[in-house]
Amino acid sequence: MSNIVAIVGRPNVGKSTFFNRLVGARIAIMDDESGVTRDRHYGEAEWCGKFFTVIDTGGYVTGSDDIFEGQIRDQVDIAIDEADVILFLVDSDVGVHHLDQEFANKIRRSKKPVILVANKSDNNKRLHMSAEFYELGMGEVWPISSQNGTGTGELLDEVISHFKDEGEEDPNKGIPRIAVLGRPNAGKSSYVNALLGTNRSIVTDQAGTTRDSITSHYNVFGKEFIFVDTAGIRKKSRIKEDVEYYSILRSVKALEESDVCVIMIDAERGIESQDMNIIWMAHNNKKGIVILVNKWDLIEKDSKTAQVFQENIREALKPIDYPLIMFISVLNKQRLFQSVEAIMKVYENRGKRIPTSELNDKILKEIDYNPPPATKQKYVKIKYVTQLPTKSPTFAFFCNLPQYVGESYSRFLEHKIRGYFDFEGVPISIVYRKK
């Protein structure tokens, strides 16, 4: 079981900078704009052989009618509830703020170890100013600089002293990683929240609500998954803020690190150019692809509506013809568990291995019936085929003249492999080697 440390505090005290220092990567978005982190998100850290999960949270604000700030408070409450140790960050450059006092009163009631961290203590003046925070009545004050690392070693010694065990190294290893992608407001966060049964990400009718890629664990059918809810990806010309630009970079990174990409499409809008760009990105990165057409409950239907809609998607995506397509309604919870079964199938297809003997028995017969066409009076003779030990299905065909095999014949071989062995939802790579 991983130990959990939550980083909390009012806006713009450096929580995300400290989070990134602990986990050793720029996972959370950092910006001078207050309220950049809206959701809670997780990273893994280690200190002196002790492993722990770190939760970064949004800035806690009271007395505001802003819809986002109200939901951020809920996210912070959930993080506090999950945590074994709470790091309460304050700003030495500003001194004691009334929100610090209000938040101190709140977390004092949690009955959990709370460590008061005076961030931005990166010069002598601020170091002396950090003593002001003793008036919060939270015990010892730990001055640090998340920017340059000053004081973090001593702080982490204190943090791990509260752990009951050493935790796990890389607890996510081997767990299927699913990136939920799509245009803004396609229903990505609502989908993840519906599966989890909790408000893991903030959901409103306003596009662009999710700014960071939010990671969640999900157990179903005796299997564990990691779902990554991402910010909506839109065209570069429509990106108006630096923060949105960084959000999209995180979404692309989530795609690159995933095993299966779930692309959410709004049924009322149909498949659009940016949907196709995302699918092509997943294809080029050799990821499994599941297309979920959301808001299907809003479409007037007859017996052929789904078939026609699916044909339109496949026509738009040519020559990519393998994604698994499903129609769902997150609002009405229609086919949500079936969608997880589809994701599971695609994940298993991506890792499927075909024995060489079975592969040759089936595919060489097809090659005998339809050999590669001659090029420049050169005849290609394929001797055998084997599957390579790669993350996504790759098949090597050994032949006398690999340079003369055309792309159309590769598509023919891919079609036959799919017909015999069912690789729905995953790309297949064909390579040729000289024998």
UniProtKB/Swiss-Prot annotation:
Task: Tell me the ranges covered by the KH-like domain, including all copies.
Answer: 352-435
Q: Which Pfam family, just one, is annotated for this protein?
A: MMR_HSR1
* Highest taxon listed in the record's lineage: Bacteria
The answer to whether the entry has keyword Ubl conjugation is no
For biological process, the GO terms are: ribosome biogenesis
Presence of keyword Nucleotide-binding = yes
User: EngA-type G domain: which residues?
Assistant: 3-167, 176-351
Q: Any idea which UniProt keywords this protein has?
A: GTP-binding, Nucleotide-binding, Repeat, Ribosome biogenesis
InterPro entries per UniProt:
G_ENGA, GTP-bd, GTPase_Der, KH_dom-like, KH_dom-like_a/b, P-loop_NTPase, Small_GTP-bd
List the GO molecular function terms.
GTP binding; ribosome binding
Annotated GTP 1 binding lies at 9-16, 56-60, 119-122
Q: Which residues cross the membrane?
A: none
The subunit field of the Swiss-Prot or TrEMBL record says: Associates with the 50S ribosomal subunit.
Q: Report the sequence similarity comment from the record.
A: Belongs to the TRAFAC class TrmE-Era-EngA-EngB-Septin-like GTPase superfamily. EngA (Der) GTPase family.
Q: What does this protein do?
A: GTPase that plays an essential role in the late steps of ribosome biogenesis.
Protein's name in the database: GTPase Der
